[in-house]
C-alpha cells in the first residue's frame, strides 16, 4: 500500500478560528500522521503537493431520514452509514420517521443492534467498476444518533413517553414534520424543559400551506403549481417566539427557508431565547428559478428532484439564508438526506414526495457553489457543517476525527459513484468537483 507525503496542506480549526499549513502522511485512504512542515519525509513515501487539500474536522448532520426499518427499498441503514462516511460525516442524527417509528424504546434498541451488525461500515464498500473507488477512505468512524418521536406515530396527537425515550438514549425529540396542535406543543415544551434535550420543530402551518408545492409568487402562477405562502413558515416562528420565553427547553428551528424566517430568528436570538436554527443545504444553492428553467445541462424544468419541503424560495430568500449562515444567525447547515425510489421520484412535480439525497454531495456542491464564488469562507462553512451542528445536538463541538478534502477532484454523479443505491438528486449526471479522500480516526 503506497504511502504519500502531502506537504503544505491547509488545516482548519473552526473552534479556534485558525488556519495553518501541515504535512499529512496518508497510507491508502487513512491519515496516519499530521505534522508541521519540518517533519522529515518518510523514506518510502511518495511526495505529492498538498497545497490544494484541506484537513479539517469531520462533518456532523443535524437530521436526515433512514429507510430502515420499513422503507429498505429506498435505502438501507448500511447504505446510509456508508454514504455518510464517504461524504465526510463523523456524526449523523436520524429522524424518527421509520416504520415502526422511533416512538418507543424498543425501536431504538433494535436500531442500535442493527447498527452493531453493520461491521462493514469500517471496511469501505467499493462498487464494481467504481472510478472513484481508489479515492475513498478504507475506514472511518461514524456515530449515529437518533431523534425520538415527540408524539406517538409522529401523528401530532398524543405525546410519547419522553422519560423512557430519554433513558433509552435519544439525542433529542422531533416528529420530523410540523406539529399543528398548539396545546400539545406547549406540553412538549414543558416536558422538554425537564429533559434538557433539544426539541427540533418544523415551522409550518399546514392550513396556510394548503396543497402548496412551490413558494408563492409570480413563478408559481406562471408554472401553474399550487403556491405555499411565506406566512406558512413565518407565522409559526412568530407564535413560538411568544411561547419560548416561558420555558427553558432548547428549541431547534428546522428547515428555515425564507428571508422573513431569518429575520424572525434574528429577533429570537436578540431576545436571548434558548434556540438554534438550521437550513437545508439545497436552499443555499437553488432558488425557484431552477424549477422554472432547470439546471443545465442535464436537469430539466419541473424536475421532481427539485421538489423540497419547504419549497425552494426566490433569489432574495437564498441570499438571506447565505447571509444568515455567514453571520451565525442560522447556526447550521443540515443535510436532510432522504432517499426515494425511482418510481416515487418519476411522478409529476406536484405528486412526487419532496426530498433528495445529500451526504456525498453537500460538501463538494457547497464548496463549488459558495466558497469558490466567495459567498462564504471555508471557516464559516466548516462551522456550519461541523462545529455548530454538534453544539445544536448537545455534543462536544470538537470532533474526534478529521477528514482530508480535495476540492479539485473531478467526478460525475452517476450510478456507481455513490455509496447508496438512491439517486434522487437534481445534480444527477452533472460534473462535480470535490471529494473526501482520507480519514484520520
UniProtKB/Swiss-Prot annotation:
One of its GO terms (molecular function) is dihydroorotase activity. Residues 121-140 are annotated as: Disordered. GO terms for cellular component: cytoplasm. GO terms for biological process: purine nucleobase catabolic process; pyrimidine nucleotide biosynthetic process. Keywords: Pyrimidine biosynthesis. The keyword Secreted does not apply. It comes from the Bacteria. The keyword Membrane does not apply. CDD domains: DHOase_IIa. Non-functional DHOase. Belongs to the metallo-dependent hydrolases superfamily. DHOase family. PyrC' subfamily. This is Probable dihydroorotase-like protein. It comes from Synechocystis sp. (strain ATCC 27184 / PCC 6803 / Kazusa).
Amino acid at each position: 500500500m503506497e504511502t504519500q507525503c502531502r506537504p503544505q496542506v491547509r488545516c482548519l480549526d473552526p473552534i479556534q478560528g485558525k488556519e495553518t499549513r501541515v504535512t499529512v502522511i496518508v497510507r491508502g485512504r487513512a491519515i496516519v500522521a499530521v505534522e508541521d512542515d519540518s517533519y522529515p519525509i518518510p523514506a518510502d513515501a511518495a511526495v505529492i503537493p498538498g497545497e490544494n487539500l484541506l484537513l479539517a474536522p469531520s462533518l456532523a448532520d443535524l437530521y436526515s431520514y433512514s429507510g430502515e426499518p420499513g422503507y429498505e427499498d429506498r435505502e438501507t441503514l448500511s447504505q446510509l452509514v456508508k454514504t455518510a462516511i464517504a461524504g465526510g460525516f463523523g456524526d449523523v442524527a436520524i429522524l424518527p420517521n421509520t416504520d415502526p417509528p422511533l416512538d418507543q424504546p424498543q425501536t431504538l434498541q433494535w436500531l442500535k443492534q442493527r447498527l452493531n451488525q453493520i461491521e462493514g461500515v469500517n471496511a469501505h464498500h467499493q462498487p464494481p467498476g467504481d472510478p472513484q473507488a481508489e479515492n475513498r477512505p478504507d475506514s472511518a468512524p461514524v456515530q449515529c444518533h437518533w431523534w425520538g418521536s415527540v408524539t406517538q406515530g409522529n401523528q401530532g396527537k398524543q405525546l410519547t413517553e419522553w422519560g423512557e425515550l430519554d433513558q433509552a438514549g435519544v439525542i433529542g425529540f422531533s416528529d420530523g414534520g410540523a406539529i399543528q396542535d398548539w396545546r400539545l406543543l406547549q406540553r412538549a415544551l414543558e416536558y422538554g424543559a425537564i429533559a434538557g434535550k433539544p426539541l427540533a420543530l418544523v415551522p409550518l402551518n399546514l392550513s396556510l400551506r394548503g396543497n402548496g408545492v412551490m413558494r408563492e409568487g409570480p413563478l408559481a402562477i406562471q408554472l401553474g403549481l399550487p403556491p405555499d405562502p411565506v406566512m406558512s413558515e413565518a407565522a409559526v416562528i412568530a407564535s413560538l417566539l411568544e411561547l419560548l420565553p416561558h420555558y427553558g427547553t432548547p428549541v431547534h428551528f428546522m428547515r428555515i427557508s425564507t428571508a422573513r424566517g431569518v429575520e424572525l430568528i434574528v429577533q429570537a436570538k436578540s431576545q436571548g431565547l434558548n434556540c438554534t436554527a438550521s437550513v437545508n443545504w439545497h436552499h443555499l444553492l437553488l432558488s425557484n428559478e431552477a424549477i422554472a428553467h432547470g439546471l443545465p445541462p442535464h436537469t430539466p424544468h419541473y424536475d421532481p428532484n427539485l421538489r423540497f419541503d419547504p419549497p425552494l424560495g426566490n433569489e432574495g430568500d437564498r441570499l438571506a439564508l447565505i447571509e444568515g449562515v455567514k453571520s451565525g444567525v442560522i447556526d447550521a447547515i443540515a443535510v436532510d438526506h432522504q432517499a426515494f425510489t425511482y418510481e416515487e421520484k418519476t411522478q409529476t412535480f406536484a405528486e412526487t414526495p419532496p426530498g433528495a439525497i445529500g451526504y456525498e454531495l453537500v460538501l463538494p456542491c457547497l464548496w463549488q457553489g459558495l466558497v469558490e464564488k466567495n459567498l462564504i469562507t471555508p471557516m464559516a462553512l466548516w462551522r456550519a457543517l461541523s462545529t455548530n451542528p454538534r453544539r445544536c445536538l448537545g455534543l462536544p463541538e470538537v470532533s474526534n476525527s478529521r477528514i482530508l478534502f480535495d476540492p479539485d477532484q473531478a467526478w460525475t454523479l452517476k450510478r456507481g459513484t455513490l455509496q447508496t443505491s438512491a439517486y434522487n438528486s437534481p445534480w444527477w449526471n452533472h460534473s462535480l468537483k470535490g471529494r473526501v479522500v482520507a480519514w484520520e480516526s
